[in-house]
């Protein structure tokens, strides 16, 4: 296997997936606000439910997809996740009601296993002393996607609030097609594990953390960081529009700066 080429594809995959997510951040709250009749308070509560549903589906389904990647390999899980996200964004682009838009976020949470599987892929193909640097590069890709994504989403959302969803769909589907031809499998058959439901559920994953105290501490830190991080996209767009009258473009450019800072830290500090 050409490790450099494989890591380059994983870098591009993470960048495109986060870009596809980022382009929606400036416009999805606006769509919810429209469905709620312009009531900012109700829209904020509903968008919070959107974010909760997405996170809950990830919590429930990520262990399952992780166990499937241990059994069948990383490649099919990554490609199916990219394909599923692309189809989901098309569904959200044409959703005529708030209910169907909510269903779209649930589907997105179910299929959003690309990032975690990408980290498993990196662990498969890099030596232990090089993993911190490789993980740092993936973190930089994450930040890069959040630089370009919100900026594009804000600019396109000013033209049509549905347009960023079509761009997200195109990015994910193109990435899935590209990966079909260039992404090799990283987990050889002799290293694969039998599928077991005790590992393929959130409770099993939490039991694993409990048995490894260093991992438990890191997981607690990551949980706190993500709680703080998820507050920003959940309320910032609506708050900035209500308090300061910011447009989708202004919000998108502001969040792009946040993504730039994240990419800088991940790329230069980690590893």
Roles of regions detected by a PLM:
Residues 15, 88, 99-113:
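Hydrophobic core of transmembrane alpha-helices in multi-pass small-molecule transporters
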Residues 184-221:
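Juxtamembrane intracellular "pre-TM" segments in multi-pass secondary transporters
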Residues 27-44, 234-250:
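Short amphipathic helix-loop junctions that connect adjacent transmembrane helices
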Residues 141-181:
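Helix-loop-helix hairpin linking two adjacent transmembrane segments in secondary transporters
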Residues 49-65, 256-267:
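Central cavity-lining transmembrane alpha-helices of secondary-active solute carriers
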Residues 59-98:
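Conserved MFS/SLC helix-loop-helix module at the cytosolic interface between two early adjacent transmembrane helices
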Residues 104-143:
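Cytoplasmic helix-loop-helix junction between adjacent transmembrane helices
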Residues 3-30, 34, 212-232:
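Pair of pore-lining "gating" transmembrane helices in MFS-fold secondary transporters
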